């Protein structure tokens, strides 16, 4: 199947299921220069043309200060789409270098928090009521496993959520799409992709989780689809439910 049609079909289903896009929306796409956000912009561009919904789209690229990440080609690629991409300069990397972890590496969680704050502020400054991120199905499953392994909880990110402090709604229209289909779509459209300049690139906990899951998929091919179905099957959740539901008591019981 044509990867563009496949990804766009996932996009439309996500919008139908979670009512992500409405008339009058002004949506800011968090642009990274990678395949996910670029394909998301393309899907929004097509959706605006062929759906009956009236909405505006802009792109926002938060420059973290890593350097060597050239976004100009990506901006130029989308110029015919009539979707402006704004660059927000920050000193986030300088801040991260002051808070290195025990292994002298930058902290991914702090980076994500600072980047999100810069993105939200920029989106509001440009009059946007929604922010669209390029997270896909594989990201959702990886997040689920990271939370289970490191946090002892069944949780992943939501396809749509209100950021209460800012009043901005965050949406993830590619949440049903698989990463390999997005990669095929980017290749077919010959999208210029900006290399990730993060010093931790390829050596993160998320990358380790991705590698573990890919190994699992080789041994159990059906698990990939089943994991996605699991995240949507909220009516069939069977976990322990102690009659004493005191939070502190629960934490004590799960301690080794």
Locations of regions flagged by a protein language model:
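Alpha-helix boundary/capping detector
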Residues: 70, 104, 145, 149, ...
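Residue-level detector of flexible, active-site-proximal loop/helix-junction positions
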Residues: 66, 92-94, 161, 177, ...
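The feature marks non-catalytic terminal segments
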Residues: 191-256
